[in-house]
């Protein structure tokens, strides 16, 4: 491959990594927000059984959403790591060509 091809590869991988990191940050923020919402649910001691069930269900829904976001974030972290490996390999080839 030529120097230009390696440079294009490195640039494309840099862009992909930046995009994935942006998505990961958004998912991390969403997960933290869902956990905060779950933690802020309060149940009065005088609440009816139906209210208690409703609040617990609401808390479970928030925690499920947080766990889903954490899982998606972990998947993106793996993709970022793979892209970084490819980018580093392309950068090494580029340095050898120069």
Please report, for each region that a protein language model flagged, where it lies by residue:
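General helical structural elements
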Residues: 12, 28, 63, 88-91
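Residue-level detector of intrinsically disordered, flexible termini
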Residues: 1, 46-49, 65-68, 76, ...
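Long, charged amphipathic alpha-helices with heptad-repeat/coiled-coil character
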Residues: 10, 70-98
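Extended, low-aromatic, Leu/Ala- and acidic/polar-enriched alpha-helical coiled-coil segments
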Residues: 56, 60-63, 67-70
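Extended alpha-helical coiled-coil "stalk/arm" regions
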Residues: 23-59
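Short, charge/polar-rich alpha-helical segments
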Residues: 1-29, 68-74, 78
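General helical secondary-structure elements
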Residues: 4, 19-20, 32, 49, ...
């Amino acid at each position: 491959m030529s120097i230009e091809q390696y440079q294009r590869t490195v640039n494309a991988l840099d862009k992909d990594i930046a995009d994935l990191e942006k998505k990961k940050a958004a998912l991390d923020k969403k997960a933290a927000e869902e956990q905060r919402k779950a933690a802020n649910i309060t149940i009065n001691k005088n609440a009816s059984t139906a209210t208690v069930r409703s609040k617990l269900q609401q808390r479970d829904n928030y925690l499920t959403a947080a766990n889903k976001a954490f899982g998606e974030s972990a998947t993106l972290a793996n993709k970022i790591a793979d892209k970084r490996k490819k980018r580093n390999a392309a950068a090494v080839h580029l340095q050898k060509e120069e």
